[in-house]
Regions:
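A Zn2+-metalloprotease active-site environment signal
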Residues: 1-194
């Protein structure tokens, strides 16, 4: 069964997202493959889904997040965090590991379901493991460092999730993500990066 995640067309917001993604891709392992990236906007039924990568350099970003990012700098940083995380999934090849595409393995727990992203219930999704999610955060923070972006902003975003009692889901545990980000940021401080 071929399934497509529903997308939204919004030229002004798409331009913002593409420009932000281009900065990140330019400092990534894919710096010579910018034109291969396809970035789509989607109104995910589950509002806490900010973005996702599905392989072959295809990334979906929450339309709501992108609209807010065009108006408020705090959301712009959240968009940048989301893009860096999703680009990192792509550069790490997470969607294609084990010879299985993102759409053809069952979720093994309460992660993101097909319905959460606007697909029929008959479509099964494969969530990335916690280790792969943490790897994407780590690589994403590396892109931020290369761009000269302050890692403390990444940490504050996760602290904001924690203050709102948003624990994430089984594959995106806020506490583990925050602990890792603090450690990476502390190393950057010690190395004189920030």
């Amino acid at each position: 069964m071929r399934a497509n995640i529903p997308t939204v067309s919004d030229d002004a917001v798409e331009l913002l997202v593409r420009n932000e993604a281009a900065q990140i891709i330019a400092v990534s392992e894919d710096k010579d493959r910018l034109s291969d990236y396809q970035i789509f906007l989607s109104d995910f039924p589950r509002e806490d889904i900010l973005g996702m990568s599905i392989g072959k350099r295809r990334i979906y970003i929450s339309h709501k997040l992108a609209k807010l990012a065009s108006k408020r700098v705090s959301y712009l940083w959240l968009l940048r965090q989301t893009l860096a995380h999703e680009v990192a999934h792509e550069t790490a090849g997470h969607a294609m590991q084990n010879g299985l595409t993102w759409f053809n393995r069952r979720t093994l727990g309460p992660g993101i379901s097909s319905v959460d992203v606007g697909l029929p219930q008959s479509v099964t999704l494969r969530n990335y493991s916690v280790d792969k999610e943490l790897e994407a955060d780590s690589k994403g923070l590396g892109y931020w460092e290369r761009l000269g972006w302050d890692c403390r902003i990444w940490v504050r975003i996760l602290e904001g999730f924690e203050k709102q009692n948003y624990a994430g889901d089984v594959f995106h545990p806020t506490e583990k993500r925050l602990q890792q980000a603090r450690g990476i940021c502390l190393r950057e401080e010690k190395d004189g990066v920030i």
